[in-house]
Every structure is written in C-alpha cells, then in structure tokens.
C-alpha cells in the first residue's frame, strides 16, 4: 500500500531555502516599500472561544483572525460605520498602486465634471420621467412658486442648481434635515430612487417629508409661511448625526457659493485680480454666517430647546420662505437698512430686470434657451416651473447679492448668471439629433447669455452706490456682533481648498470650445496628463483641484491602514465632498445593507441588531476564499428578492447596476466589464440571447445606469425570467462574474484580506512551502495514506514520490481553495473509522499535532492532506492561498509585470527568424503550442547556405533534442468534422525523431468537437516567450513585399505556396495544392511579439498548466512527465558576475585547450563526479543515463543562458560568465540578406542579437574540466522534471567556485543586463476543458475596457470582426463598445477615429456556405455601427469617425496579371498610441467567450514616451505602441519598398485630417477604384452576388499595366456591399459548421 525510501543525508527543503533566500529578501524589500502602512495594535480583544470557532469554521489562519479582530474593534459595525470603512480601505489600497495617487486624482476630477454634466443633460432630456413608486421630490409635481429668500439660501439655491456637490435642490432647512433619515426601504424600488436622492444628502437617504415644499405654492403668503416653517422646524427632533450631516451640508453651500463667485468669464479676464479679492471677501462673510448657524444648531441640540431652534433658523438664514427683500437681508444687514426705502429700491430693481429678461426671452423665441442659461443644472421638477417664476428667482438672486457685496461684485454676479453654459451632452442623451442642431442651439444660447449679462451688468452698475453703503453697514454690523465673532473661525482653514475644488470641478469653468475640442483626461489609465490635447494649458482651477486631491490622497497613503480612520474626518473633507465618494457611499451602503439583512437571517438576529465581529469575519472568509459554490450561493442570497427560492432578472440587474457604477473598479480593471444588461442576459439566456445589444443598453448614460430605473422591463421582447438557486449556481461555472459578485467581493478582498496577506508575507515565508505530507487516496473503496514530499512553487503544488526524482503529482493552484479541517469535522481523520489500520494510520492517529487541510478545485473535487505538524500545515495553507490568486486586472491569471523587453515581429519572415535564433540557443527546454504545426516549414529563408534544410523546424528540434534539450509540443487534436490538419502525423513524426527528449500531446481527445486550441506559443528555457497570431506551419511565412507569385520556389517552396481561398491545405502534404503558373498565392500579414522576464514566466505558467491538464485528461499520456516552473530568477537585480579582476577578455580558463578544437567531448554524468558542468553544458542529461556523448561540429561551443547568438567569428571560447556588451560588428554574417528592407523594425529583428533584443550575450564553456560558478545556479536550473540534476547541481556548487580564479588578469567591471521599459500583462481565454480551471475571459474584458477609455483613436487589425450591435447574435459587444465611443465623440464634437483593418473575406471558397455567412455577419457588425449612429445623428458623416479597410496586391506573371487579397491574420489593438494588445484572439465569440477556443494575448504599455502629435498638437506617445503602428502603416502604404521620409513623418499623427483623409482614406479609395476598373468581377469585393463572381486572372496589356502602376501600397477600402444581394443561406450544414465558426 505504501512504499517510500527516506533520504539518507539531504532533503529538498534546505536546498530550496538556500536557493531562494536572496530572492525572498529582495521581494520582501520591494513589498515593504509598496505596502500600505499596516501596524496592528496587537491588543487582545477577543476570546479564545471566538478564535477557536473562527479557526474551525472560516478560511482564515489564527494570525489573520487576530488581525481582523483588531480592525473590527476599531470601527463602528453599524451600517454607516462599515460602509465608511470599506470606502477608506479601498482608497488606501488604490493609493499604493504605482501612480495610484495621480490616477485617482484625475479620476475624481474627471468624474466630478462628467457626472454633473451627464446628470443635468439627462434631466433636460427626461423632464417628464418620474417613478411611480418613488418617495423622492422627483415624484411630486413641483408647482411651487419661487420666492425671494435670504442671502444664504438664495445663493445656495443657485449653487445646488450649478454644482450639485453635497446639497439637494431644495433650499429650506427643514427639507435638508428631513433628507437625513436613517430608514432604508427594503423595497425593490429603493435602487430606482437612489438616482433622485444622490445629491440630496451625503448619505443618500430617502426624503420622506415633502410637505415643506408644498408650503411654497403661494407667493402672497410669504410672511405667514415664514413663521409657519419656523414652528415646523422647532418641533423636529434633531440628532447628533443629523447635526453633523447638516454641518457638511452647510459647508457644501459655502463651497457652492465659492464656485459661483469663482467662475471665470472670458470677457472680463483683465479684472481677475480684483475679482479674486472680492471672491475671498464674499466667501469670508458667508462662512461667518454659516458657522454661526451650525454652532447655534449644535447648541440647540444640547439644550433641547425648541425656542432656540427657531432663533437658529432666523439667524442662520436657512428658511427659504422669506418673501420680500427685507427678509432677505435680515441676517446680514443692520436694522437701519431694513427700511421701506431700501425695500422699495430692491423691488423696483427686481421688476426692471425681470421685464428686461422677459422681453429678451420673447424676442429670441426660445424659452429653453433662457432656462439653460440661468438654470442649466436645474432639478427636473424645478425645470417645469414657469418661466416667470424662474426669472423672478434669478432676479432675486442678483438683486439680493448685489445688496450684500461691494461695488465691483457685479463681475461675480455676471459670472453667476452666465456660468452655467450649456455643454454638449454625453452618450445616451437623445434630445439633440445631430451636431449641426447642437451647434445652432449653442450659438443661440451664447447670444442670449451675452444679452442677459449686459442687462444685468447695467442694472447692477446703476445701483452700485447704494450697494457700497449696504456692504459697509453690513460689515460694521458683523464686527459688532459678538456671537458671530466667537464662532466664525471653524471653516476658514479650508476656504482655499473649497474654493479651488468648486472652481475646478464646476463644468461651467470649461468653455464650450475648449471642452468639445478635447476629450476627458486620460490620466487615469495613461498616467501623465497630456496638456497638448488642448490649445491652452489646463486652468488654474483644475490644477489646484487635482493638487488638493493629491495632497489628501497622500495623507491616506501615509496613515496607518488599521487606524480606524474614515473620510468623515476633517483632513479628508475635500475627497469626502467629491461626487465619486457620494456615489460610492450610496452604492456600498446598499450592498452592506443587503449583507446585514442576510446575516440577520442566517444567524437569526433581531431586525435592527448589527452583526457581530464573528459573523462578519465568517462571511468575509466566504467572500474572499470560499469555494465557487459557496460564493455563488452567497451572491444569490445578497440579491433583494421577492421570493427566497428564485431570483428574477430584474432583481439581479438591480444589484449589478449598482456595482457597475463603482467607477474605480472598472478603471482599475477590477469591475464587471460590459453593460449590466449584457451580464444578466449571459446568465439568464436559454441558448442564444433574445435581446440585442441596443435593446439591452438603456439610452441614458452608462455611469447613471444605477440611479435610473431599469428600462429593460419596459423594452419589447423583454421577459423577466427567473432562476432557482441550484440552477443559478450551476450557471456560475460558465460565468466568472457571479462568484465575484460582479466585483464587490474583489473590493472586500482588497479592503480587508490583501493588507493582512501582505503584512504577513513581509515576516513569513509565505510564497513557498515544502515538507512531508500524507495525502488520502482510495484504492477502490479502501482509503489509504501516502507519504510524499510536497512543495508549493510558482502556482503549483508539486509532489515527489522519491526525492530527486520526477514529480508524481502536480496540482495547479489557480483559484483553488484550501481550508483547515477542525477536529470536530466529520471528515477529520480522527472521525473516520478505517477497517484496515496500518502503521501509517496508527502513526497519524497517535500524533496530537496532526492537522488536516483540504484543497478544493474549481470543479469541487477535493484532496485531503495531513501534516504531523500544525506549523507545517499552516505554512502550506498560507503558501497555497498565496499561489491560488487570480483576480488581477481584467480578472486575469497574471498581474502586470514591469521592466519587460518586448520585440514586435511584423509578418512571418522576421518572426520565424527570431524563433529560429531562440531555438538554436536553447539550453534546457522548449515549449511549443499551436493550432497547426508543420514539421517541414523553413524558419530562415534569407540565409545563404548549402544545406537549407538545416533551417527547417524538424531539423532544428532534432539537433536540440540530441543535445539534451527537452522539447514539449502541445497541439490541437482537430476533429474531422472541422478540418484535417494532420496533428496525428505531426505527433508521430516528432516523437520518432527522438523519443526520449521530444514529447507531443494532442488535446482534446474527444470532446469538445467544435472548440480548438488557438494559442500560438513558443517558450525557450522559460526565459523568452513568443506569442501572437503566427503558427509554425505552411502558408504563414511572408515579408514586406507580399508576393502573389513564386514560380521558382525561392521564398515559398513546395507546399508553402498556399491560397486557402482556392484550396484549403489538407494534412501536411509536401506538394503544392495550387498551380503556381495560373493561380496566385495568398499573402499573409500577421504580428507577433517576444517577451522576457516575468512576462515570459507567465506565458510559461500558461503552457505548463495546459500541458499538465492535457496529460491528466487522457490516460494515453500517463507516462508523460509533468512540467513545473523553474526556480524564479530574481530579475530585479543584475545578473551575478564572477570575480572580474582575475580574468582577461582573451584568456581561456582551460590552459590545455586554448583553441578548443576538440570535436568530441565525453561527458560523464555520474552523480559522484564533481567535475561536471551540469548547468550550462549542452549535454543530454536524463534520469537513467550515466554516459552521454555530444558531438560539436564547429569551433564555437558557446551556449547562452539568455538564448542569444554569440560571436560566430571567434574561435576561442569565451569562458567568462560576465555579461558581455553586445558587439554589432560580429553580426555581419547574420545580417547580410534582408532583401534591401529599409524598415528599421525589420532590420532590428532579423537578428535577435541586436540592441533591441531582450538581453545581452553571455557565454559559457562546455568542457569536461570546466565547472560553473555557484552564482549561476538561479539562472540555469530548468523546469524539466525527470532530470535529477537539481540536488546534484546544488551539491557541487561550493566545490566548483575556485575554478573561476585562474589567470590573474584585470578586467574592468561590465554593465548589468539592461531592463526593459514595458509593463506587460498576459491575458487569455481558457476554461475547464482547455486548461482545467474556472472560466477566464480577460482578453474580452481588456478589449472593452481599453475601447471605453480611448481618447483619440482606436486602431484594430483582426482576422474577424463578428460582434453584436443591433442584433441578437453574437453575444460579444466589441462593436457596441465602438459604437458607444463614436457616439460620445459626436456628442462632444471630438475629433476621434476608429480604423479597422480586416481581410477582404475569411479563408475559404467564396462559393462555400460558411464563407458567405461569415461575410454576412461581418457586414452586419460593421453596418450595425453605422446604422445605429445614423438613427441618432441622421446628418453625421460617419467617415469622419470610422474607416474600414483591407489589403490587396497584384503582380504580372507572364502574359497574365495576378491579384489576391493580403490576408490580415493579425490580432492587434492599439489605443491612442499608448497601449497595445497583441496575441491570438479574434474578434468573435469563439475567441472572446472564454469557454470556447483557448487564446492568449499581451497588454503592453511602454513607459518610455516619445514626441508625437495628435490632431496637430504636441503629444507624448508610448514608444512601443507608437512605433508599432507607424511601422504597420509603412507596410500598408508601401513605404517599406518606396521610402518617403516626409510621408513617414506625417503618419505619426493619425487623427489629423491631412493624415486620416488625405493619406489613409484617399490612398485606399484611389487603390480600390483602380482594382475595380481593371479586375472588375474577378475579385469578390466588386460582386453583390456569387453569380457575378468570375474567379481568374486578366490578360496583361500595356494599358492595364500602366493603370495598375498607379497603385500605391496595398491599402484598399472594405466593401460592405460585397454579396449584399445574396440571401443569407441556411442549411443543416450551415447550422452546424458555420455556427461553430461564428458563435460557438
């Protein structure tokens, strides 16, 4: 039952510890620098019983339980306290992200601007929108007559209509107080009402008392209403929390007054200094009055005197029912000014101004124009107020303010009226049909604004003498008021902050011209703000606002995370008053309330009782570490439901809309990417979706979707279906957003668990663990225990049956779950009675410290382990948890990695050569994964050699296998239903070449029938990785000339001459399937990249995970080895160097062989021989081989630890392990043949040893007397698992150090390896069948996120474009995201471009049904974007925003002329020349869904910025993305073969008309016209139905040749009318095959 030979002298644990010690120290130093300040107080605040209970029931360790207890004892665990703590903890995490403070500051500023704009635009376009079941002021018809009010409330009324920061739109004190009730409705309508309440108070609570608003109906009852309202207020019960909220509300009023007085007008900039003086004077006066009010209210609360409250209201000026101007000035003017003469003067001025405004309004004939000018941010119900009342209110505002300010305050009043300029609405607003109408309306509003301003200015100037007297008297009275002098200093310290906040956040500060010409800031995902996007630098207000955000975010970063702070504290007042925090508070409070309700039900608590700490810790453990089933069940319980047993679509949509509105989650890639309706439809749909993307996306702005009532239930074809909990949990397997609660559980993890994990990692070896464990297994029905050595490393749990042997078990830990099994649990080993108890069972049962823990995988399979030491069990549990994380940006398995060198390869010629160079210098292992692999494909066709066969893939792999390199190939096992790619023959061919060192796995064995492995991966030594769209197969090789003929078989020999539009390649035939003389080949355009560093390790992890899963899924591969990752290289430090002072560049270590001309080296691999170089030699090292002979046929036996070529002209061996500088003079032989390619990128990539490659050269010696340095250990231990060299290498390292001290010659120190400048994140599409894990569709989420965040342009090259916009199939919404982004650009009048480069049509015969269907659906995806835009903007020119193009080439072949499309197979997304996505994923459901084809891509952001231009303005572009796009355009425009420096410089600016129209579109149109004229219906894009298509070539004539010579480059237009008259074919064949290609 159990056989095990214990080790005699050494174990693996000290080996691993010694190897990783330096690396762990470096990692700990980096972590401590980037972690939030976490200093637990370590106070015993819990009982041992609580600890024991939580340790047994939760997923936390004892240390984590203690720290969580420590936190929760410092916060209030009520609804408000827990909500505030979540918000603070979230911000604390985000500010510690690199550039987090900058990104958050820009995000908060931009959201303030955008949010107010969207809200008010939506109000204006939905004036009649009311919720029937809402209890907010939106639902009550407001027929109130606006009356003149006090100075403070009049200003605040205007403020709330303008700023909408903290205050609601009502102005009387009783409404403000009534808005602060703590009763949360559990009704489902609550979320629909939140939209209405968002700006009514900070805590966003329902307004239950609207009676006071109705008291304002009659203007003739002003004085009576004043007394009545004061008596109503005095009868209210005030709480301390309400007073605090009121204080905040009053502060926001103060802020909004500052905002109005600080709004700039371009016509009066020469008075700016004078304005600032009076701005601060006015602010100081208002602060005094509001401070007095707040202090007196607090005094009222303490004294509980109703009479005092009335006095407060009267003194504070909060009552809004004062009718005449005498009551307006009661709190600020002395009794001497409250005379009849003063009242008469004010009334006369008011009537005069009102008449002037009315005349101007009637003259213009545009009532809405005046509304927009005076009350741009008016509440919807207030907008319905008659014009006369609005005019009266405006008149009251100006008149009242004029009597309380100095002589020059007319400038501030002027700005008050014109500050609310109409700004063009954002996406989703449908009132403006086209941009022409929008411009006309804007011009008319500007004219009205100017006239109104002039009238107001004249009126104020005429009354300025009296105003001066009034202000002077007011100041004297304030100085004589002792109460105000004692209480007016509370808010003065923050006056500057408040002023700059509202000056910058007010949307009116941005003029129409500057705002519409430039997009929103791209800081929050690009980093630095691009000032060049505007014609002038950012305003002072914006700079001050962002700086204030930065300062307070810096305070959060420096504070102790466990200090119990919240944003309610004064030091965070600026952040707390932002619109984003108000929105977060409301949403999180809603979720926390749902959570508390669930806890009360689960633990049978009283209705109003708050959960205990134990309850919260237990639930948080499920949220963050629970199983898939547990998390999904918790999500089901958190939804507010009508029935406990089922959840309806509208109920789930309600919660998702709220979480989706957490902008910070989406910006940082943590949220649920995609519209809420799309997510819900994916969960509830039966088969294909019945709701198209237009229907399931509301017309209102997306960021407001949470606050609006869901429109889905009112849409046609909507069916409010339901799911039971069992079915809901079942569907969570195929929807990764459900177990995450659509991002909310990620938020909880970031707030509470990640800080603890980081804190513990800084003091505990958390990432690795090793030791002996017993694991349970069953032999039939008999349970047995097996003792194995296990180690946790790089995301895998590895078990060894014997030490120093190959692993017997490898478990991928990605998104697994581990938990300690308490002794009381029925599955604990003490509770299980075994029929047969052997010695091992007795040994386990007899140990009191024996601890059980269970590991659960994504499919709920479990594996139980038993450790005889509780400490060791805890280490394993912690290490497993650390290695099982997967919720990184875009929900990817990999986190973004810094300092990566990325090399792009355009077309197959450069890519194949780069792969050949890397394979040639492989030293330990090679991983290859592909959709199709051809063993005979040639990798280097430009080199001159007498034996060109040595460049074939099979020859290269055969050579490396004979040298001892392990080669693992993972290939798609295609089904005959789909196609025949000859994978069976490939497997047989490769394994016959070298059975020991080449292993090939075909996957999947049987099911699924339709899905494929579409990843294209090459990994060499786990150090350099190649990914992209190119397979190592026939038909992929091409260069910058895109030849359509090759009669002499120079570039495309044999079967490599392919045209898959005529005949698809079958198997791996060596014969050509098309006639070279009469049929053209189809050129192939593709893009791939190479990566190094930790990004290459992430690609390695992906391959190893897939390999091990494929091995386990088929018993035929039981004997194949498991793969594991190599020990991680500390890439953050320079490569180690031997003592350089003893070495000379031209001196060899081996004195006996200076020329190293030995042709044969016999290398003994016996474990007892200490003179063997096992680390760097190219020997065949296997588990059962003792003597290996390697023959070298040339003089340079150099091997590179970085897979790079070395000096081929040097006969002497370079034996130093130093990093050698790259010598370009030695690369002449490798760069002789480049086909006169003038492209810098191509020249740089033909040889991987150039300066742009991933690393510099290192060389070592393969000699039987030469030994390696111990410093090379970390860089040479491979991941091969049946090589026993790991302990042997480590055992020999100390004995071999002295070999590097020969030849005492001085050598100056050499520079370390150069780091890259790119940040790279690997994203992919995998699921259970393809990788043995939960569904991951991070590629799709990244595409959507980057399209939504684009600012200037989107450039896409892809093989397919099958997406959803306006129809039900397919399900992905890439096209819809593009449509929404163009719609936003139209509404903002932005210059924005979207360019799609697609093939003319997909591979396959044009007469085939599936090819016709793909053409149809591609055209539907494109025309869907255009159709929906034209519906909304009938007069828009879509060509200004969208360009669809293809590539085509021609050539003369004898007496005929060939032409064929250049097949665009690349999968590239470039956004704003800042960020790029490159990989294997097409734009269709197969690639993006995650549950279908397996895909892999890389998101690349380069921190190295270069000077560029956008729309003619200076711009900083990322070097990688910018150079890649420019190189691609040079290829497409023919600038490679015909260089034009001027044209190459112009294409740097894609956005400007002179490039987009005059170069790109003009060249495409001209080339398309020539092709149409010459070739006619012989090319498919000129045919509207298949009967018109006449495949073939044309005869060569001088006229045709002369016309074709007018074609420049290869660019043509994509014709959406191709086969437009052909009906959509339907057949059984199309239903099966085509659905596989399109949707499945």
Curated annotation (Swiss-Prot):
Report which reactions are catalysed by this protein.
a 1,2-diacyl-sn-glycero-3-phosphocholine + H2O = a 1,2-diacyl-sn-glycero-3-phosphate + choline + H(+)
Q: Which GO terms describe its biological process?
A: phospholipid catabolic process; phospholipid metabolic process
SMART domains for the chain: PLDc
Is Repeat there in the keyword field?
A: yes
Low complexity compositional bias: what residue ranges? 133-193, 264-273, 467-499, 1149-1274, 1282-1296
Keywords of this protein's UniProt record, alphabetized?
A: Hydrolase, Lipid degradation, Lipid metabolism, Repeat
- In what residue span(s) does the PLD phosphodiesterase domain sit? 1009-1036, 1460-1487
Q: Where is the composition biased (Polar residues)?
A: 122-132, 232-247
Keyword Hydrolase assigned to the entry: answer is: yes
What the record says about activity regulation is:
Inhibited by butan-1-ol.
Annotated EC: 3.1.4.4
- List, in alphabetical order, the Gene Ontology terms for molecular function in this entry: phospholipase D activity
Biased composition, Acidic residues: where in the chain?
197-231, 521-534
Q: Where is this region: Disordered?
A: 122-247, 264-283, 439-499, 521-541, 1149-1315
> What class does this enzyme belong to in the EC scheme?
hydrolase
Note the Pfam families from the entry. Answer: PLDc (PF00614), PLDc_2 (PF13091)
Positions of the catalytic residues: 1014, 1016, 1021, 1465, 1467, 1472
Q: Where is the composition biased (Basic residues)?
A: 1297-1306
The UniProt family comment states: Belongs to the phospholipase D family.
This chain's function reads: Plays a role in cell growth. Hydrolyzes membrane phospholipids, such as PtdCho (phosphatidylcholine), producing the free headgroup and PtdOH (phosphatidic acid; signaling molecule on its own). Involved in the inhibition of actin-based motility and endocytosis. Its inhibition causes complete collapse of F-actin organization.
List the PANTHER family.
PHOSPHOLIPASE D (PTHR18896), PHOSPHOLIPASE D C (PTHR18896:SF195)
The entry's protein name is Phospholipase D C
* Protein source organism: Dictyostelium discoideum (Social amoeba)
